[in-house]
């Protein structure tokens, strides 16, 4: 892939895999303790790539690979990365009324179960080739999980220490696989901005600065990311389709997959239309109007970001579509039940968009969809009916016999006014309050009453014992944002589903609030004054536990006798 050589700050030439590059000016921040500098490189730095359509390969400064056939006996499992199958989609295509041929590139057949195996191996081998990564070194990577699994897999085979930093949102299946591969795992708050020191990116850079001979391969900036798809994935697609591809549909996370494949297809199939998929709540799509939504969170993992990664070349995408959780999980389940493809949620995102975008294609034309990962990582999520019901993605079957209380509303419970805590209260004081009142958890709210998160006695005590916080630290440092909200109008059946998985649920109601009265999204941050613009805020009504539900049912049972 023709690309300009990026210049490091010390003047040496190299690509992002030259990992000892110094942060650019403006990227040093004072720490909370005073003059301590925060050393990091932002994952959205401007790209220096000079790839242009039509520019000869000889101009490329990069090392390029050529797809090879696998031997009958593989020397190690890393040779099982790549050469994934192309499968015709039959029933979904027919039901959608498509005239064109719909094909799926099944990336979950890679050794580690996802498309990210390709870039993980490529980043490591390019760093080894450059002499940056040496035996005994440590690999650190901020990731949503799949890149981490790919890196941990390669590190296990090659003998590197591997530390993976990922948000709390990501599934426990990913955590379990990473641990089994020998990786060390650090979890970070899901809602932390990418440029926050508490984000998965920020924590990874802090670890890199503390651990000798450690490297962040940096999938967000590393040219090896799109190169893996330019050299291999795209060539496989062209070979499997005999050079005939009329449309490609791919979701975007770091953007390396869609960038690398699109650049090669634009060179070899000039008429091929590239369709990008970006979830609602992410900002990767263009034009910018597509990203305007009140939604900031989504359940689908591995795609979408709140920044534009360096490796994403949006110029090669002809059109963007926004995906949503409902369609994504519905189509992921359809791919499993109707096509037998055991894929993950982001595969559903891509397929949901593909059946819309491919409506414009005619008979004899061909649409290829990238299915990024497998269902293995989501057994407790969208594959679970309970999880789908709890999240509101499925409706209860009315024909199923339920207890007498199942369809009663949450408002039937006699909930007392909740104990709430301000984010500036210390951990020590909060623990004392919870113990005095006999509570295990409490909502943390700002001065106007909007919910910032939850704090639990167990989480605070474990954080104190692990040395992550001090007793004098503000409680906002141990904030838990993965709470399950429920409304007064929701059923006790829905509450029951939540309490099967969690110790408590937060009963909330929405309130329209002027922004000059509310704090910003940063926990413990200053007042966000924005010309009185109004927005919806979640306000706490009460906290309900399994004991509350059992007491209600038991009391009503007595009166029913």
From Swiss-Prot:
Location in or out of the cell: Cytoplasm; Nucleus
Cofactor(s) for this UniProt protein: pyridoxal 5'-phosphate
Documented activity regulation: Allosterically activated by S-adenosyl-methionine/AdoMet. Activated by S-adenosylhomocysteine/AdoHcy. Binds non-covalently to a heme group that may control the redox sensitivity of the enzyme.
Principal subcellular localization: cytoplasm
MF annotations from Gene Ontology: carbon monoxide binding; cystathionine beta-synthase activity; enzyme binding; heme binding; identical protein binding; metal ion binding; modified amino acid binding; nitric oxide binding
Cross-link (Glycyl lysine isopeptide (Lys-Gly) (interchain with G-Cter in SUMO)): 208
Residues binding heme: 49, 62
Enzyme class: lyase
InterPro entries xrefs: CBS_C (IPR046353), CBS_dom (IPR000644), CBS_dom_sf (IPR046342), Cys_Synth/Cystath_Beta-Synth (IPR050214), Cysta_beta_synth (IPR005857), P-phosphate_BS (IPR001216), TrpB-like_PALP (IPR001926), TrpB-like_PALP_sf (IPR036052)
Expression sites (tissue/organ): Expressed in liver, kidney and brain. Highly expressed in the hippocamus and cerebellum.
Residues bearing PTM Phosphoserine: 42, 196
EC number assigned by the record: 4.2.1.22
GO cellular component assignments: cytoplasm; cytosol; nucleus
Quaternary structure (record): Homotetramer.
Name of this chain's protein: Cystathionine beta-synthase
Species for this entry: Rattus norvegicus
Lineage, highest ranks first: Eukaryota, Metazoa, Chordata, Craniata, Vertebrata
